[in-house]
């Protein structure tokens, strides 16, 4: 990136800037980088903060450093975008994660159907309209989407984003959900360069796992179509005294190791390179047919009278005449013969009445024939049993039909795929890719340890009981 720094003006933006510390550090870093390359740059800092106290501190800090205080806005970034017409060269943030954004919903969603009215969070993508709205309990990815809406296309460098998220941003949300749509939009646009795992206990107010997402809309040639994962969870130094939840820090050598892995862009124990498609999958809905048995019984006739009334008891006589009180295992034949007889006898029942009759005199039974929904030119379409419905996640690189034949049909031979419900999703199982197998202890070692413990505790029980 440093080779692309020019003698020009750069805009730096933090949409959750707090007291402005990250903005200030970003400016220092960029100035040092430019100076080292013999370039003269002008840097303008932009930020937005919702907390009044930290906003005031940020404003004061900007005044002391003779910066443009008008570029620091006080409001919720999600509800009131302070820079709707701006694009930025560099963007960074450590947004709140695991925090509800319900207070901002009315500014983003409208109506009973919660339609998106803020264009930052509704995009056209590959012929689809994607809603980039995560669950209301966690709005961290909305801050990322806000930044993506402000990327600059007009320069060779484009825009570069570095943002910290917790682990849930990597995988939370099923295919078609707001979270998955956001990941899909980013990865299919080939913006995601790298995700770097950080140590636990890095921040004052939480000890959970966190990750840096590095995003660019102008990737270098060798990175196009690729995503790099760097496992830096064990590269840190311990603080002598904890500060809240923060008990570790990144030393210079820890930062250098991460930087070297990123620049090297190759496979190692702590670096993995993937194709964009490796994180995608098709969620398919697997259906199985409904099976009914049919029988006219005294209990069901009584239920019929209670629900349908005495005026329709003549229908029961038709059923008895056709099927007696024997169990019928092919509901399709029952339905055909019964409805034919109704026409002959002059009965004109509404569909809802027919459906209720079938509901009363049938029950689900695997011994019965599969219920036919309709006949088409392509063949028979069976009625699906909602209770047997299942889903499978098929990797994008796999053919759906081949996967289905290999993984599903050997176990449920009557299943089929509802192709109208196929949805594409994305998730990044970071820890899975860096899992290190821990060899189990041998049985001999465990037995030996138990025997040693038994020797150490010999006589203790006797002392407890008899003293």
Show where each model-derived region lies.
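A conserved structural/catalytic subdomain of Rossmann-like adenosyl-cofactor enzymes
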Residues: 85, 89-462
């Amino acid at each position: 990136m440093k080779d692309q720094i020019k003698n020009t003006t750069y805009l730096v933006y933090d949409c959750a800037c707090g007291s402005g510390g990250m903005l200030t550090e970003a400016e220092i870093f960029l100035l040092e980088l430019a100076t080292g390359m013999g370039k003269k740059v002008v840097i303008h800092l932009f930020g937005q903060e919702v907390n009044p106290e930290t906003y005031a501190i940020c404003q004061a800090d900007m005044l002391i450093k003779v910066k443009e205080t008008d570029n620091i806005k006080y409001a919720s970034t999600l509800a009131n975008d302070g820079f709707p017409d701006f694009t930025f060269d560099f963007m960074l943030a450590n947004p709140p994660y695991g925090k509800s954004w319900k207070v901002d919903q009315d500014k983003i969603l409208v109506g009973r159907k919660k339609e998106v009215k803020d264009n930052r969070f509704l995009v056209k993508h590959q012929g689809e309209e994607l809603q980039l709205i995560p669950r209301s309990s966690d709005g961290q990815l909305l801050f990322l989407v806000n930044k993506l809406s402000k990327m600059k296309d007009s320069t060779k460098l484009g825009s570069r984003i570095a943002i910290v998220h917790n682990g849930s941003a990597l995988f939370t949300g099923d295919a078609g959900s707001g979270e998955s749509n956001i990941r899909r939009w980013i990865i299919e646009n080939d913006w995601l360069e790298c995700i770097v795992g950080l140590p636990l206990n890095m921040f004052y107010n939480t000890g959970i796992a966190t990750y840096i997402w590095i995003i660019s809309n102008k990737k270098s040639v060798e990175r196009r179509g690729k995503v790099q994962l760097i496992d830096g969870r064990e590269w840190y130094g311990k603080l002598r005294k904890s500060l809240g939840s923060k008990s570790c820090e990144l030393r210079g050598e820890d930062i250098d190791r991460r930087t070297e892995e990123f620049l090297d862009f190759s496979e190692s124990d702590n670096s993995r390179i993937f194709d964009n498609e490796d994180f995608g999958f098709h969620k398919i809905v697997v259906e199985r047919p409904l099976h009914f048995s049919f029988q006219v019984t005294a209990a069901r006739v009584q239920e019929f009278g209670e629900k349908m009334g005495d005026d329709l008891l003549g229908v029961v006589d038709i059923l008895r005449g056709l099927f007696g009180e024997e169990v019928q295992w092919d509901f399709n034949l029952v339905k055909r013969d019964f409805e034919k007889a109704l026409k002959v006898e002059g009965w004109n029942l509404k569909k809802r009445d027919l459906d209720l009759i079938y509901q009363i005199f049938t029950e689900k039974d695997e011994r019965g024939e599969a219920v036919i929904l309709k006949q088409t030119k392509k063949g028979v379409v069976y009625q699906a049993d909602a209770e047997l419905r299942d889903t499978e996640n098929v990797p994008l690189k796999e053919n759906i039909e081949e996967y289905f034949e290999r993984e599903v049909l050997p176990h449920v031979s009557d299943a089929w795929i509802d192709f109208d419900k196929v949805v594409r999703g994305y998730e990044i199982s970071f820890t899975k890719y860096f899992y290190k197998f821990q060899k189990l202890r041998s049985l001999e070692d465990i037995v030996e340890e138990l025997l040693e413990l038994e020797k150490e505790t010999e006589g203790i029980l006797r002392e407890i009981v008899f003293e």
